[in-house]
Amino acid sequence: KTRYWVTHGDATYKYLQINRVNDEESLAPVIDIDLSSYDIIAIADYRCGFVIDSFVKQCLEAGKITYASSQVSSHPSNYYRYEDFDYIVCNERESKTISKKDNVCITKGSDGCSMNGMDYASYKVDNPVNIIGAGDCFYAALLATGDPDFANMKAAEYVESEVYE
């Protein structure tokens, strides 16, 4: 990432951010994890080059339940890498690039989500305080329970909370 900042008065604002994706296997760190002790394997791929094809293959070969979510960016979709995973979480735009149709949870922001042909309404948020991270909260709640409605509720609670980094 390269960020460019602008100062106006006493405040500094992010003016521009340029993200680069590097999927070269040779530049990725060696991931040496014994996956046999885990019940499920969940990947949140933020497209920084750490989730490489050999690790995706290792996850599939572990014989565990697998989940994948990938960061939306201006780069072409990388969901093709996760077609063989048991569950995929993506937004509507990304869902159009996926041939797999079962066990795909499509997030729709304030419009809720859909999974396996069922729509799940979002929970009303009167005073959104912090929307950054709502998708991560949704994904964590979905992983914990497998319930898209519960995940929507937790994401709404998060948006209304005052969470500071």
Q: Residues of each region from the PLM?
A:
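4′-phosphopantetheine-dependent carrier domains
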Residues: L142-L143
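Conserved single-residue anchors adjacent to enzymatic active/cofactor-binding motifs
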Residues: G135
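Ribokinase/PfkB-type carbohydrate-kinase core domain
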Residues: K1-I131, G146, F150-E165
